[in-house]
């Protein structure tokens, strides 16, 4: 039995302009090589583009996109009797949001386009509407979990 204490769960801080935790989580995931100011620039440009495209509150579009992409269940590889099974597990809200942000950024990086702000804004608008690569990834994950429901007792 471990004598080590459990780590305290860190809460994400909110960003300076929008005072929103989701924006800050997005900034921290898009960050490369410690260039946080560039990450903030990309996010804020993307938010402005969302404002221009949809003519609604861009933060509500962001919230809607992340909520739409957040998975409720995923599969985890588990070794049982010499073979590896894909065991479906439930995902908490924090982990689900983190996965959703990761999928949104991966999908926007794959997109063809001028720059990252343009690609990210397009992906977020698509995800808010219920289409796009990130939504497809969520559906794929849910389908995998559903097809491996027989192994749910291996948890």
Curated annotation (Swiss-Prot):
Record GO cellular component, one term: chloroplast
Gene3D superfamilies: Ribosomal protein S7 domain (1.10.455.10)
Main localization, broad class: plastid
UniProt entry tagged with the keyword rRNA-binding: yes
Keyword Cell membrane: no
Gene Ontology molecular function, alphabetical: rRNA binding; structural constituent of ribosome
InterPro entries on file: Ribosomal_uS7 (IPR000235), Ribosomal_uS7_bac/org-type (IPR005717), Ribosomal_uS7_CS (IPR020606), Ribosomal_uS7_dom (IPR023798), Ribosomal_uS7_dom_sf (IPR036823)
GO biological process: translation
Keywords: Chloroplast, Plastid, Ribonucleoprotein, Ribosomal protein, RNA-binding, rRNA-binding
SUPFAM superfamilies, alphabetized: Ribosomal protein S7
Origin superkingdom: Eukaryota
Xref: Pfam families: Ribosomal_S7 (PF00177)
Subcellular locations according to the entry: Plastid, Chloroplast
HAMAP family referenced in this protein's UniProt entry, alphabetically: Ribosomal_uS7_B (MF_00480_B)
Subunit structure: Part of the 30S ribosomal subunit.
Family: Belongs to the universal ribosomal protein uS7 family.
Task of the protein: One of the primary rRNA binding proteins, it binds directly to 16S rRNA where it nucleates assembly of the head domain of the 30S subunit.
Name the record gives this protein: Small ribosomal subunit protein uS7cz/uS7cy
Organism: Lactuca sativa
Upper taxonomic lineage: Eukaryota, Viridiplantae, Streptophyta, Embryophyta, Tracheophyta
Originating gene: rps7-A
